Amino acid sequence: MSLASLETTINGAFDARETVTAATKGEVREAVDHALDLLDKGEVRVAERAADGKWTVNQWLKKAVLLSFRLNDMSVIPGGPGKAVWWDKVPSKFEGWDENRFRDAGFRAVPGAIVRRSAYIAKNAVLMPSFVNLGAYVDESTMVDTWCTVGSCAQIGKRVHISGGAGIGGVLEPLQAGPVIIEDDCFIGARSEVAEGVIVRKGAVLSMGVFLGASTKIVDRETGEIFMGEVPEYAVVVPGALPGKPLKNGQPGPSTACAVIVKRVDERTRSKTGINELLRD
């Protein structure tokens, strides 16, 4: 089935999604399964970057992910600690994999790393004990550190470091129009959160504890320019606060959290945030 045919079938099924159930067979199930398989292999992705830097969201692929929850029934998923099991609709990406399959895939998955089927992991990536949700795309030589979450359909570029405990938001709940996008060579500091379709542009650095949503103000300390929904290329961002409006009694009001661009990436920053190739051999 061609991509155009897949898109047409999936869009039609999504419009009539109330009729799609675990009993649905035929063209709709085949189209959704095929789309998820393509996502799993990295042959298609939920969002794609054009030469001019603009990202296009393939909404039909996001719809395929959503439809899979209506098509698939709950089942036992083995592999829990102490021979325990899980109960879910989405199998592990690694179900049935052997040594040869992992060698061909070319990435590292440390015990405790959970990746759901339809997420793509590129060569030389490293997955510490973490969670990568369905439809996500993790590109080459990226490190997903311990206790990180990569949300549904999130797009992570090459040579990205997502530090311990950081969260990259998904698109499924609450439903978002576009996924979070982390472009190449970015550094996401420990315990930071990027959600609601925010785009972190190439080479940007978020320090520890930066929280970014679609409405978070990102203030350039040098120019006063305010960004929302997008971190500029090579920006170094730290947590900050904006002064609040005075209260009715004239006293200072509570401040509002923001993010602050303190500088652009320089050699000193690169030396602190560069990836270690030894970990990716």
Swiss-Prot record:
Pathway participation: Amino-acid biosynthesis; L-lysine biosynthesis via DAP pathway; LL-2,6-diaminopimelate from (S)-tetrahydrodipicolinate (succinylase route): step 1/3
Main location as per UniProt: cytoplasm
One Pfam family in the UniProt entry: THDPS_N_2
InterPro entries, alphabetized: DapD_Trfase_Hexpep_rpt_fam (IPR005664), Hexapep (IPR001451), THP_succinylTrfase_dom1 (IPR023180), THP_succinylTrfase_N_sf (IPR037133), Trimer_LpxA-like_sf (IPR011004)
E.C. designation(s): 2.3.1.117
Chain residues that bind substrate: 108, 145
Family indicated by similarity: Belongs to the transferase hexapeptide repeat family.
Entry protein name: 2,3,4,5-tetrahydropyridine-2,6-dicarboxylate N-succinyltransferase
Organism: Nitrobacter hamburgensis (strain DSM 10229 / NCIMB 13809 / X14)
Gene name of this polypeptide: dapD
